[in-house]
Amino acid sequence: MRKILFLLLLIACCTTACGPSKQNRKEAGEIYTTSLNLIKNINQHDSIYVNCVQYLMREIQTPSIQKNKKKLQNLSDSIALLENLNDSLIYIVEKSKTQLNDLQIDKSKYKLFKATDSIFNTYLNVANYEYKNINEKMKTISLPVKDSEYTILLKLSFKADSLLNSAIKYFNNESAEFYEKYGLKEIAK
């Protein structure tokens, strides 16, 4: 009987000792939640920029755009707004990077930091290159837009979308692994 109790006690100790400690799980939960919230905030700003670009892409194709002064003014205002939205996105990403670095100071051992930083860097690169190129192209297009100009805008949009989708896929894979590794499902309850 003593041997059975000893074996059960040994098995119980081994199974609880194999997983991450309570402190590690708590830290992992904080890192996971913070990362998701920072990315959500960045994504909201990015969506505002993308919605403005989509609106412009529809409107610049209107055949009689030159005759409608109000529509021309709206387009001009929206094109000017693109730069402000892009600058806002860059600011939010840089602010998020700072917040992540502050969180990482004493918790650098967690793998999710790398994936989160990677998605931040991708957003910064897209905002600094692809979005700025879109903004510059929008300023110089003829109205209604020529097919060649529209094709360039589509290529830039597609490139930005592809880069972001790749970074998001990488983050999603890493965060799912992180979530499972630290048993964050039980913490969320």
Q: What is the role of each PLM region?
A:
Residues 87, 93-118:
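Short, solvent-exposed, charged loop/turn and helix-capping segments
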Residues 164-187:
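C-terminal partner/receptor-binding element of secreted or periplasmic proteins
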Residues 1-4:
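Positively charged n-region of N-terminal signal peptides that target proteins for export
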Residues 74-86, 105, 109, 154-157:
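Second-shell loop/turn segments in exported
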Residues 18-84, 184-189:
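Immediate post-signal-peptide N-terminus of mature secreted/exported proteins
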Residues 49-60, 89-101, 130-134, 171-172:
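Extended amphipathic alpha-helical scaffold segments
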Residues 32-38, 42, 49, 106-161:
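Long, amphipathic, charge-rich alpha-helical segments that form helical bundles/coiled-coils
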Residues 13-17:
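C-terminal motif of bacterial Sec signal peptides marking the signal peptidase cleavage site
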